[in-house]
Amino acid sequence: MITISDAAQAHFVKLLADQPEGTHIRVFVISPGTSQAECGVSYCPPDAVESDDIEIEFTGFNAMVDEKSAPFLEDATIDFVTDQLGSQLTLKAPNAKMRKVSGDAPLVERIEYVIQSEINPQLAGHGGNIMLVEITKEGVAVLQFGGGCNGCSQVDITLKDGIEKQLLDMFPGELTGVRDVTDHQHGEHSYA
């Protein structure tokens, strides 16, 4: 469920050494399955452990995950990174905003999952997003751009060199292309 790097495990052991005995960590998601989902890590004293918590054992400590957060922490990774600017704990949870779908789910659900978990987080850096409008009988994913992508001068490059390439690589034989149906209006909201 959650992978914690050796560096992050050592960091947690060091932090927990200053806490009351029996304290572990809690990994959680606030507003799981929504676009506002946020992940966090906190101390979990023994009296804060709930009967339905999932307990994951590591060397020197355990991680507690509440039942509601668990499916949204699938494939999550925690690392402790040191660079020239210092050290920081990173938590990446690709399924926090949308529950992972199975490989045999309908094509529309699998594409929606990729859009929400991989493509939209990249576009969010420019204040943009896309949504799947439909998949045609010919296997074309019809997309609509929003936010900073609407009216952006780079939208064709983003669509063909980025999104289309990624989706065709992920769904060979199921998708034949992508098409943008956005009525692009360049304005102050547009990224470029």
UniProtKB/Swiss-Prot annotation:
Keywords: 4Fe-4S, Iron, Iron-sulfur, Metal-binding. Belongs to the NfuA family. This is Fe/S biogenesis protein NfuA. InterPro entries: Fe/S_biogenesis_protein_NfuA (IPR017726), FeS_biogenesis (IPR000361), FSCA_dom_sf (IPR034904), HesB-like_dom_sf (IPR035903), NIF_FeS_clus_asmbl_NifU_C (IPR001075). It comes from the Bacteria. Signal peptide: none annotated. Pfam families: Fe-S_biosyn, NifU. Homodimer. HAMAP family: Fe_S_biogen_NfuA. PANTHER family: FE_S BIOGENESIS PROTEIN NFUA (PTHR11178:SF51), IRON-SULFUR CLUSTER SCAFFOLD PROTEIN NFU-RELATED (PTHR11178). Involved in iron-sulfur cluster biogenesis. Binds a 4Fe-4S cluster, can transfer this cluster to apoproteins, and thereby intervenes in the maturation of Fe/S proteins. Could also act as a scaffold/chaperone for damaged Fe/S proteins. GO terms for biological process: iron-sulfur cluster assembly; protein maturation. It comes from Shewanella baltica (strain OS155 / ATCC BAA-1091). The keyword Lipid metabolism does not apply. [4Fe-4S] cluster binds at residues 149, 152. Its cofactor is [4Fe-4S] cluster. Binds 1 [4Fe-4S] cluster per subunit. The cluster is presumably bound at the interface of two monomers. GO terms for molecular function: 4 iron, 4 sulfur cluster binding; iron ion binding.
